[in-house]
């Protein structure tokens, strides 16, 4: 029986962050990974066998990863900014095709785009005022994510923005969106950040939690492209972890843990037993042990579609595709469309009109393609469909996934000057290079419970009881057992935050 200071379940990015911090502090660390490869939902894969293109199959953008973690661990890794924040095509009252273009840094074309949509400057001014407040709020709350939990009163005082606290924390996000914005399309673009991976109405408080995490990342809320794809990020974490002596064992699914005040004993699927003073779970608790208390949560409600294109398709509006697809392209995501889709999804149905958003990784970072594919003009396209609950796939995952895929393509084709099918790359068997991953696929492939990309419902980033104040938000009902993955407080997204916080809980215990 081998003995360690710390055993970690799962070699996803959070597990590797925790392992790196602990090993750097001199701890003997073992990471047990159930799959044959490391990375979990942050791996890159050659999704289409005939082409040298390594796609981020599951997670695909990074906003929440603090610069402090990159600096602390000495990660040689780069996140790239996108010139365009978003583009939302629409058909105006004269049946003309147009679109709302929002640059990452506000400019005249963004100003003109808002005016063309709304006929006034008021919506653009409201946008700048609202996101200015949110960015200020983010800059004050972001550093606290790597500190012990404060009470809500302490955090409110620390941030010292009572009005923003009220509409971001206390009241449904839908209220402030409707109050501050008058255009249905603009309202929807704002609302999408509250719904990524979250089955909620605009007036459900889970939407607030999701919105908060999507907008506070690294104090700016900017969503960046990982250079080299998610796999490059994981490879760098692996390099750092192993350089400090971390031992990583793949194909080693944990089947049992015993924990008491003296430490933990872990048994893996190969019937090997390991002991340690501490145990950290990067995996969702239900996939590790029934002994770890679990809170009930919403099921996953998104579909991820990956594509390889011979070139980007032309749009009816005439906008340069390299602008339209560089940021997030919103489809069927007006406020009213999102609410209608939720009403259908919450009773287990696939929405008639699928809200979705997409972006092209290779416009910002072509390095995930071989030089040959780059020279030939190939591009990748990622689509993320909202309000597709796991329950809608249970009767037949394959059939339901096909239906959603068809809806997604149809929704995009409505705004294209040529069908998507004409620009999809084809493999040697004549099949289009497109794949779709439903919530049930995410559960089967990377152990996300019911396809919930956050493992559990996101929680607000402060202590919700007196007992939690001063703790790290990673504690469990078992002694010496901590959560270092997405289901920890302040977990969710590609952040490394719960990995850091679990490591701190060990080092300061």
Q: Each predicted region: which residue ranges?
A:
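Mid-domain catalytic core of redox enzymes
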Residues: 253-373
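Rossmann-like flavin
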Residues: 95-204
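Conserved FAD/dinucleotide-binding core of flavoprotein oxidoreductases
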Residues: 286, 308-310, 373-408
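N-terminal glycine-rich phosphate/pyrophosphate-binding loop and immediately adjacent elements
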Residues: 2-140
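Beta-rich nucleic-acid/ligand-interaction surfaces
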Residues: 247-248, 252-268, 427-444
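A glycine-rich dinucleotide-binding beta-alpha-beta segment and adjacent secondary-structure elements
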Residues: 183, 187-199, 353-359, 418-489
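Helical element adjacent to the flavin cofactor pocket in flavoenzyme catalytic cores
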Residues: 214-263
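A conserved FAD-binding loop/helix module that cradles the flavin
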Residues: 486-507
């Amino acid at each position: 029986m081998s003995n360690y200071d710390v055993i970690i379940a799962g070699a996803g990015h959070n597990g590797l962050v925790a392992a790196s911090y602990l090993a750097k502090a001199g701890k003997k660390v073992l990471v047990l990974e159930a799959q044959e490869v490391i990375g979990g939902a942050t791996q890159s894969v050659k999704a289409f066998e005939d082409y040298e293109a390594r796609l981020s199959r599951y997670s695909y953008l990074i906003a929440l990863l603090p610069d402090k973690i990159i600096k602390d661990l000495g990660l040689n890794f780069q996140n790239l900014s996108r010139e365009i924040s978003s583009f939302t095509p629409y058909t105006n009252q004269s049946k003309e095709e147009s679109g709302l273009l929002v640059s990452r840094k506000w400019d005249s074309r963004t100003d003109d785009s808002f005016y063309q949509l709304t006929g006034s400057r008021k919506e653009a001014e409201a946008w700048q005022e609202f996101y200015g407040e949110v960015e200020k709020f983010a800059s004050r709350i972001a550093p606290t994510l790597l500190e012990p939990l404060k009470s809500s009163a302490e955090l409110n005082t620390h941030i010292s923005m009572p009005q923003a606290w009220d509409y971001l924390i206390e009241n449904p996000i839908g209220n402030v969106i409707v109050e501050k914005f008058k255009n249905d399309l603009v309202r929807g673009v704002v609302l999408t950040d509250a719904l990524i991976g979250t089955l909620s109405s605009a007036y459900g408080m889970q939407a607030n939690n999701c919105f908060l995490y999507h907008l506070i990342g690294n104090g700016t809320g900017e969503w960046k492209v990982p250079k080299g794809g998610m796999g490059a990020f994981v490879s760098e974490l692996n390099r750092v972890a192993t350089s400090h002596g971390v031992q990583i064992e793949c194909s080693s699914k944990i089947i049992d843990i015993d924990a008491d005040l003296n430490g933990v004993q872990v048994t893996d699927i190969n019937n090997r037993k390991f002991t340690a003073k501490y145990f950290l779970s990067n995996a969702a608790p239900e996939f590790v042990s029934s002994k770890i208390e679990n809170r009930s949560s919403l099921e996953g409600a998104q579909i991820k579609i990956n594509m390889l294109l011979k070139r980007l398709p032309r749009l009816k509006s005439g906008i340069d595709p390299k602008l339209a697809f560089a940021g997030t392209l919103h489809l069927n995501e007006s406020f009213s469309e999102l609410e209608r889709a939720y009403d259908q999804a919450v009773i287990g149905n696939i929405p008639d009109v699928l809200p979705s958003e997409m972006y092209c990784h290779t416009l910002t970072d072509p390095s995930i393609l071989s030089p040959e594919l780059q020279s030939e003009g190939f591009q990748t396209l990622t689509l993320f469909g909202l309000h597709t609950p796991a329950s809608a796939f249970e009767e037949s995952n394959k059939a339901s996934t096909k239906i959603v895929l068809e809806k997604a393509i149809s929704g995009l084709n409505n705004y294209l000057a040529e069908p998507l099918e004409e620009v999809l790359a084809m493999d040697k068997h004549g099949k289009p290079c497109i794949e779709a991953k439903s919530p049930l696929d995410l559960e089967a492939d990377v152990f996300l419970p019911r396809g919930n990309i956050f493992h559990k419902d996101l929680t607000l980033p402060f202590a919700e009881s007196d007992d939690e104040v001063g703790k790290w938000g990673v504690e469990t009902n078992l002694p010496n057992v901590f959560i270092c993955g997405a289901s920890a407080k302040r977990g969710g997204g590609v952040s490394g935050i719960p990995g850091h916080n679990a490591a701190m809980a060990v080092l300061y215990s």
